[in-house]
């Protein structure tokens, strides 16, 4: 496997890993809201949203390989 092929494979893996984290952030944002911590819930939602934006950058990186 060439270095660019390895990198493309890694980038796809990182997307999957990032998606899993987004799901976890969303779940904990809901839990934080349910136990009354609206501030924490909002922060976790913001983290999830920023992480969703990363997916687009990973996809751009794949295209650039």
What are these regions (language model features)?
Residues 1-26:
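N-terminal acidic leader/helix
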Residues 1-3, 25-40:
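Helix-loop segments that flank and shape redox-cofactor active sites
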Residues 7-14, 40-50:
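Alpha-helical scaffold segments that form or flank carboxylate-/histidine-based iron centers
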Residues 61-65:
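Short hydrophobic/aromatic patches at helix-to-coil boundaries
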Residues 18-22, 44-58:
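Alpha-helical transition-metal enzyme core signature, strongest for iron centers
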């Amino acid at each position: 496997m060439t270095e660019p092929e390895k990198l493309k494979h890694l980038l796809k893996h990182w997307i999957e890993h990032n998606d899993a984290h987004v799901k976890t952030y969303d779940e904990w944002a809901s839990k934080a809201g349910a136990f009354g911590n609206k501030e924490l819930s909002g922060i976790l939602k913001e983290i999830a949203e920023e992480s969703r934006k990363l997916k687009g950058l990973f996809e751009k990186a794949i295209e650039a390989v």
